[in-house]
Design a protein with these regions (language model features):
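A helix-coil-helix interface module used to build multimeric assemblies
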Residues: 1-201, 206-213, 274-275, 286, ...
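Glycine-rich cofactor/substrate-binding loops
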Residues: 1-36, 97-98, 279-458
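Short alpha-helical scaffolding segments that buttress acidic/His motifs in well-ordered protein cores
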Residues: 41, 62, 138, 241, ...
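Hydrophobic residues in alpha-helical segments
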Residues: 45, 69, 142, 251, ...
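Conserved hydrophobic residue
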Residues: 49-50, 74, 263-264, 379, ...
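Short alpha-helical "patches" and their helix-cap loops
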Residues: 53-58, 133-137, 182, 258-262, ...
């Protein structure tokens, strides 16, 4: 008979037990569940709600179970329905009747809410730790490439020259925002819901603040209905995970392109590439491609949980049992992706010579040529048209802007002088963009210093 079976005349059908069981997901929160129960039991004893000796026996029993869980000695039973019932059943088997007092003043609804808050906070901290490692790696690489010129792109067309450091720092900013999102999620989850009961709190004189103190929470939830029915913290985490996976996916997309014969900007390490079963020459960036694909999986987790929650009346509904599968899938996918991406990036080789040659092609200095005319008194719209005509001329003549003669330049506008070549050199084009946020080496160096401070503050 189930622990809640007093009102029922028969046990649940075996099909129902199997369909309803969530032990597979629940066992991942076993430690949090036991830690929550330890705090609850201590508070019950301190408040005199249960005999002190029973509270002490419960604490000893739970500590023993926790030790066995950490040692991998516990096998959970599907017949006990979920992790909460498993722990309570095992506790009662070990310490006797006192174990039946653990659930005093508590419902599984607020018990699982507490577990959820704890695992959300734990996972946020783990993810932020992984992000900090990746950000540190990107910053280290950026420092090495302050002067490595490469083309910047819009519409995947050569636009203006930048540096590899500047490009990498764009992703540093993305991942810093991701880390702040996870810290915010942790802050939002930092409310202790135990004491909410099934939905309407409890008549027992629980000291909720004491439980929060024992578990390291900063505050308690203020409404019992919301305390048991909210899954915002899981949604916040999966949303943050979706954003982070999107950033990883964009980076992976660029690495797939850069690894291609058409770009040749990077060389993937053999350990992070695969071959073809028929084409012996192939070296495929499969890991980066797979990470792109897994991004959609995390998006799916977000939509799935939003859909679970969208029509639920207050307070608890069984639909919410689906929350942990979506949460864990998103967390596992993201954390493993961060680990793999960091290792893949650390092993890559950048072909800086190819990047520089590419930056010299494609008229990436055309804007600087127009700016040159503006500095000599030509209106920008006129300068834009003149340089556009110059580019069309170069394409017909098979030349670059650097290869035009002074006479050819003056054919389009007399404002062109001999100093135009210095104005459109790669180093000048990059170095002139020295305002904060620009690609000039000194600007990127300042951005790196700023990012290091942000990283230290996470």
């Amino acid at each position: 008979m189930a622990l809640w079976g007093g009102r029922f005349s028969k046990d649940p059908d075996q099909l129902v037990l199997e369909y309803d069981a969530c032990i597979g997901m629940g066992e991942r929160m076993a430690q949090q569940d036991i830690l929550g129960s330890l705090a609850h039991a201590r508070m019950l004893g301190e408040q005199g709600i249960i005999p002190k000796e029973d509270a002490e026996a419960i604490v000893r029993g739970l500590e023993g179970i926790l030790s066995d869980v950490r040692a991998g000695k516990i096998t959970w039973s599907v017949d006990a329905e979920d992790i909460h019932m498993n722990v309570e059943t095992l506790l009662t088997e070990r310490i006797g009747e006192a174990g039946k007092r653990l659930h005093t003043g508590r419902s599984r609804n607020d018990q699982v809410a507490l577990d959820n808050h704890m695992i959300a906070m734990d996972q946020c901290k783990q993810t932020v730790s992984l992000l900090k490692g990746l950000i540190s790696l990107l910053l280290e690489t950026a420092r090495e490439h302050l002067n490595t010129a490469m083309p910047g792109y819009t519409h995947l067309q050569h636009a203006q020259p930048v540096t590899l450091a500047h490009h990498l720092m764009a992703y540093v900013e993305m991942f810093l925002r991701d880390a702040r999102r996870f810290n915010f999620t942790c802050e939002m989850a930092d409310e202790m819901p135990l004491g909410s009961g099934a939905l309407a709190a409890t008549t027992y004189p629980l000291n909720r603040e004491r439980v929060a103190e024992l578990l390291g929470f900063s505050a308690i939830t203020e409404n019992s209905l919301d305390g048991v029915s909210s899954r915002d913290y899981f949604l916040d985490y999966i949303y943050a995970a979706s954003c982070c996976m999107m950033h990883l996916s964009r980076f992976c997309e660029e690495l797939v392109l850069w690894n291609s014969s058409e770009f040749r900007f990077v060389e993937m390490d053999d350990a992070f590439a695969t071959g073809s079963s028929i084409m012996p020459q192939k070296k495929n960036p499969d890991i980066a491609e797979l990470m792109r694909g897994k991004t959609g999986r995390v998006y799916g987790d977000l939509v799935a949980l939003l859909t679970v929650m969208k029509g639920l009346p207050l307070a608890y509904n069984k639909d919410m049992q689906e929350d942990k599968e979506r949460f864990w899938d998103a967390a596992d996918t993201l954390n493993r992706s961060l680990e793999v991406f960091s290792a893949m990036f650390a092993s890559m080789t950048f072909r800086t010579d190819v990047m520089r040659r590419s930056a010299l092609d494609g008229f990436a200095n055309a804007t600087d040529c127009a700016d040159y005319l503006v500095r000599r008194g030509v209106a920008f719209r006129d300068a834009h048209r003149i340089v556009g005509e110059l580019v069309a001329y170069c394409l017909d003549a098979g030349k670059t802007l650097e290869e035009l003669t002074p006479e050819e330049y003056r054919r389009f506008d007399p404002a062109f002088g001999e100093d135009v070549y210095g104005a459109i050199s790669l180093e000048t084009c990059v170095g002139a963009r020295s305002i904060p946020g620009g690609p000039a080496p000194q600007a990127v160096a300042a951005a790196i210093a700023s990012a290091e401070k942000k990283l230290a503050a996470l």
